[in-house]
Amino acid sequence: MDEQAIVCSICRVLVTSHDYGKPLPQDVVLGKASFPAHNGATAKAAFDALRRKPFVVDHGKRGVQLDNSQFGALIQFLYDECGWDRFELELRIKHFEGWNEIRW
């Protein structure tokens, strides 16, 4: 499994398991993400790569959380890079008002 696939798996965890206002620690996120056990080093690299995305707020050792003001960038990333379809995006990310700005 490559790093990009793991980044997408981690994004799925953040979208489905977020706790408003609280960052999710790396060990919790990686424990919920789907990847083969032998890819632990790649998963840690993927988590570090995700920290630098514009739709993620990095809280250092406390973990990461989604940036509510950057849902457009998150949705575009999930659609373009992770293969999420429009239906799932609209189902999972309900409080976004810029759907007409997404490049489908």
Regions found by a protein language model. Give the residues of each.
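Short acidic, hydrophobic short linear motifs in intrinsically disordered regions
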Residues: 19-34
